[in-house]
Amino acid sequence: MLATEQSRPAECNGAHAHEKTEEVKKPLYSRPVVLTTYPSQSRIDPFPMNWGAATAEERGPITVARSIETLPHRNAVGAHGGSYSVYNALAVAGGFLPPDHRPNFELTEPTFDFPELDSWHDPKKIVAMDPYGHLTPSVFKKYLDEGYDVRPTIAITRAHLQVTEIQRSVENGSLPIDGKIVLNEKGDIAVTKVAVEPVWYLPGVAERFGVDEVTLRRALFEQMGGAYPELITRPDIKVFLPPIGGLTAYIFGPPEYLSDTSKSLAVRVHDECNGSDVFQSDICTCRPYLTFGIEEAAKEAQNGGAGLVVYFRKEGRALGEVVKYLVYNKRKRTGDSAENYFKRTEELAGVRDMRFQALMPDILHWFGIKKIDRMLSMSNMKHDAIVGQGIKILNRITIPDDLIPEDSQVEIDAKIQSGYFSEKKVTEDDLSCVHGRHW
């Protein structure tokens, strides 16, 4: 005879009762899946977005969230957080983060109040970041109070940098301790840091690249696996938050000096190279040039001017680290000669460089920079992009020869021959004589 509830031991009955009364877990999203939206739908009423307007209020907030409250009013495609938006999704799926979480922005205000500049209102000068991204909790407070999910895309703070090469320069006396910029014998450097997430105004981005907006939208949609269908179905939405890394700007000296043309300014624009910047691989000059730029920026601030280092997340010339390492293998297995330096990348990636510096000057415009006294870069692409945006470069500073690792001579000579600024002349014939080590 089968056991019944009455014939079972009490502890079994209790356990069984507990199982029966356990609440069924509610689904994260109760409404039907909305794959995309269209401008003609009845509930669609996006908040006005007037890119380049004279004030933040006239421009309007950037609303990208897909919450029930915000979805009809979205005026941007994409998601906050850039590439980290994926981890946000994992946190929600795993039950660690409520999908309707709203941040508490109390005490997160910028540590420096950058004055509003004419460039913030110029739709030709700023197309790849939200000029009001640091002011969201204040200038768009009424939207937050009404329950809409609007978030900052810029954060500003203060910090101390500790860099081994800087400490050595302090120890050998080449970088003095002044107590304001270089703080102590350990080589701590005081900086203002600005983190920026990308916010693209699609008509402006298309213009920078010399293509029409429809072509840009289709390419973004197709090459990202169809992840953002509203790039196609919502031509009325002109703003896109792409799933890529942003930038961090490190300011040495008073931030207000960046826009003061009476002050001397040293600038290093640097694209991420994890292998060298962090782990000090010697196959390229990235970390040596970065630390040289930091030291020169600090010296400029000590001399009464200002320094700026802008660090972009564009790993491996924006080809990615996997592609970069595959290229390294090709190079090392074929003799690693300077004459084939770019060829090996093109064989694998189809292009030698995808950093495309057209969007890079936006952060310089945001700071109000009109001239750079000392450009700590040899890149012709960066130089041309900056000058092409109307910012003067008075002097270009090359990396000192004694900072170039032996195995990176292949890279630097190939780049000089292809157009990098240098007093050194490198011909095509010279490249065939320059080789790196096997491994």
UniProtKB/Swiss-Prot annotation:
Listed GO MF terms: GTP binding; GTP cyclohydrolase II activity; metal ion binding
Compartments, record wording: Cytoplasm; Nucleus
Binding site for Zn(2+): 273, 284, 286
Binding site for GTP: 268-272, 315-317, 377, 382
Pfam family membership, one: GTP_CH_N
Gene3D superfamilies assigned to the protein according to its UniProt record, in alphabetical order: GTP cyclohydrolase II
Chief location bin: cytoplasm
Source domain of life: Eukaryota
InterPro entries: GTP_CH_N, GTP_cyclohydro_II, RibA, RibA-like_sf
Any one of the GO CC terms: nucleus
Family listed: Belongs to the GTP cyclohydrolase II family.
Name of the featured protein: Uracil-regulated protein 1
Organism this protein belongs to: Schizosaccharomyces pombe (strain 972 / ATCC 24843) (Fission yeast)
Lineage per the UniProt record: Eukaryota, Fungi, Dikarya, Ascomycota, Taphrinomycotina
